[in-house]
């Protein structure tokens, strides 16, 4: 237990000291997104998630909501909408009861973040997921980052849920 806490603390400390690397240019005032554009991007992120992870319609999700260029930062998924489909189609076939419940949606500029409870089945404790999507000017997803953490089987130290 001590080793786990030490490793977690060390990892957090090292991450906090790491330089930030932005793979896309920061927005200027002229490029900043209007509230209506951010609302559109939030709606598109939610619709993409519903199609892909609840209806399991990956083809339609990618066709409607992913741009021609799609950069992926998940180490298990290659760039492109087709790579997303190729990665998740076998997973969804193997886990037909999998569902994703979006708990929070946050937008800033061209970015939308979703805080999600992902489960393989209704009985599964699941995972807490934060997906961050970057949108182009047409409201298409062109870049993706994610952070995934298992939901503990026992009570959390704080007694609060992850959601």
Where are these regions (language model features)?
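Positively charged n-region of N-terminal signal peptides that target proteins for export
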Residues: 1-4
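C-terminal and inter-domain tail/linker signature
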Residues: 17-163
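Bacterial N-terminal signal peptides
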Residues: 7-15
């Amino acid at each position: 237990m001590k080793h786990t806490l030490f490793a977690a603390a060390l990892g957090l400390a090292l991450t906090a000291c790491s330089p930030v690397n932005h793979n896309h240019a920061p927005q200027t005032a002229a490029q900043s997104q209007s509230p209506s554009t951010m609302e559109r991007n939030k709606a598109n992120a939610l619709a993409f998630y519903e199609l892909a992870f609840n209806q399991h319609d990956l083809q339609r999700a990618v066709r409607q909501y992913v741009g021609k260029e799609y950069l992926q930062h998940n180490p298990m998924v290659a760039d492109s909408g087709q790579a997303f489909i190729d990665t998740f189609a076998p997973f969804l076939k193997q886990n037909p009861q999998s569902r994703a419940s979006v708990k929070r949606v946050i937008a800033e500029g061209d970015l939308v973040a979703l805080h999600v409870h992902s489960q393989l089945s209704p009985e599964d404790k699941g995972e807490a997921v934060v997906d961050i999507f970057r949108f182009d000017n047409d409201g298409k997803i062109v870049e993706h980052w994610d952070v995934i953490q298992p939901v503990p089987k026992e009570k959390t130290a704080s007694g609060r849920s992850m959601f």
